[in-house]
Amino acid sequence: MKRIVATGTFDILHPGHIYYLEESRKLGDELHVIIARDENVRHKPKPVIPEQQRLRMVQSLKPVDYARLGSTTDIFEPIREIQPDIITLGFNQFFNEEKLKCDLEENGISAEVVRIEGYSGEGFCSSRNIMKQILIRRCKELQDDSTD
C-alpha cells in the first residue's frame, strides 16, 4: 500500500486546494493530510478559520482518507507516525526541496518528495485572492450604501 502525505493550512478552501489533494491522491492508495496548527502558521497571516474547523472541512473531502492536525512542537512527528512513501508539496508551498529531503532523512523518513503543479482552472485559486475580492466587493457595497 502506497501512502501519500499532503500538508497545508487549508484556510478558506478553494479549487486549488481540491486540485492539490486530488493530484496527491492519484499518486498512491491512501491520502493522509496534515493541517497546519494555528500557532505554527508563520509564513503568512494567521488563518481566518480555526484549526478544528479547517480539519473538519478537509476530513470531509472525497480524495482524503485521513486528516489530522500537525504537531505544535515537531513538524516531523506526524510524518514519522504515518511513514509515507510520498510527500507532496503544493506549487506555492515554499519549501527548499533539497533541504526538506535532508531533514526527512535526518528524521528517519525515507519518502519521495513530489511537487504538484499549480491549478490552472477558472475561479479563485488562492485564499489571499478570495479575501482580497471580498474586501474589494464589500468596500464598494459600503461606499454605494453611504451615497444613498
Swiss-Prot record:
HAMAP family: FAD_synth_arch. ATP binds at residues 9-10, 14-17, 92, 119. Keywords: ATP-binding, FAD, Flavoprotein, FMN, Nucleotide-binding, Nucleotidyltransferase, Transferase. Pathway: Cofactor biosynthesis; FAD biosynthesis; FAD from FMN: step 1/1. One of its GO terms (molecular function) is ATP binding. GO terms for biological process: FAD biosynthetic process; FMN metabolic process. Homodimer. Its EC number is 2.7.7.2. Its cofactor is a divalent metal cation. Pfam families: CTP_transf_like. This is FAD synthase. It comes from Methanolacinia petrolearia (strain DSM 11571 / OCM 486 / SEBR 4847) (Methanoplanus petrolearius). The keyword Metal-binding does not apply. InterPro entries: Archaeal_FAD_synthase, Cyt_trans-like, FAD_synth_RibL, Rossmann-like_a/b/a_fold.
